[in-house]
C-alpha cells in the first residue's frame, strides 16, 4: 500500500486508515517518499500491468492518464475524521475522506465594478475528471499553460460556453 508522502497533510490520514481498516494483516505500508516517487510508482505499475494500491489525489494529470478506481469507503464521518488527521490518534475509526470544496470568491467592489466578470466566475465549474484529462494531455505533450488552456477551449466547449454569453463564446471560438 503506497502511502501519502511524508510531511503531507494526508500522511496521518492514510496511516490511521491503514490501522483502522486492519490492512497490516494483508498489506505492507510503503512510504512514498515524495509526490514524484508516488507518481512514478503508479506509472511503473501501469506499464507492467501490475496492480497498484495507494493514495492519490485529484484532479491531477495522473488521475487523467491512468484508469484509476476510487476505493469505496464509508461516508465521511466528522467525529472519526478528527482522529484520522491526528498522527497520535490512539484508536482510529474508519471514515471516508472529507470533500475538498473549491470556492470562487470576489470582493464586493468587483461585483459592483465588473458585474460581467463576477457573473462569469459564479458560473465557472469544471468536473474533476475533465480537469485531470486536460492536465494529462498537457503533461503527455509537454505543453505550456497557454497550450493547455487552448486545448481546453477547443476540446471542452460544452463546459466553458455555459459560463459566457453566446456572443463571447463566438469570439473565443473565432480566436482559436
Summary of predicted features, one role per range:
Residues 1-2, 121:
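Short, well-ordered beta-strand elements
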Residues 100-113, 136-137:
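A bilobed periplasmic-binding-protein/Venus flytrap-type ligand-binding module shared by bacterial periplasmic
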Residues 5-9, 32-36, 111-115, 125, ...:
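Soluble non-cytosolic domains of exported or imported proteins
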Residues 4-84:
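Ligand-binding pocket segment of bilobal, Venus flytrap-like solute-binding proteins
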Residues 39, 98-100, 107, 120:
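Domain-level detector of nuclease and nuclease-like folds
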Residues 10-14, 38, 42, 113, ...:
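Stable alpha-helical elements in mature extracytoplasmic
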Residues 119, 123-176:
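C-terminal functional modules
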Residues 15-27, 37, 51, 89-91, ...:
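Metal- and O2-centered redox machinery and metal/ROS homeostasis
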